[in-house]
């Protein structure tokens, strides 16, 4: 059974599908907590399809989000701390100020999203897809990212992107645009990193750009 969930202000609309036909539909008026968040914590949300223009201020703490799709323009100010996120697809334009602290799962698809101020620290997201993402001011410290792909991702932060103490075994950073980063104390066995240098041309601070890349490479372990 598929559940299609639409979130609008305080109201959650749920349609239950069986064999591609609507079996029933319900609307729920959700109370918000003191911080103004809709609380969807500690729930089994397997096979849900979340839809909406903007999904904002929803708490998914410790919820089961296996085989879930988020289809919306934007997800903002949401919290997925300690959630299970196996086979989750984010068909969004932008994730802004979203927390994935200590989430666990595999095959999470963020491809072609703008990830703006997203905290992935201490999460386990093996075999995940960050292809063609624009990544700004986001944190990947202490992550397990085994065999994940960042192909043609753009790291656009003014400050360095941090992967400190992360497991980056077999991770592909293929043709990324990246001039700052910190890979201190990472596990980098079979890691592949190729940088798209096209930003060099026309860069006003060419010396600074090159120095930042050198500093980033210097943080890689000797066996990288």
Regions found by a protein language model. Name each.
Residues 2-12, 17-224:
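Tandem repeat scaffolds
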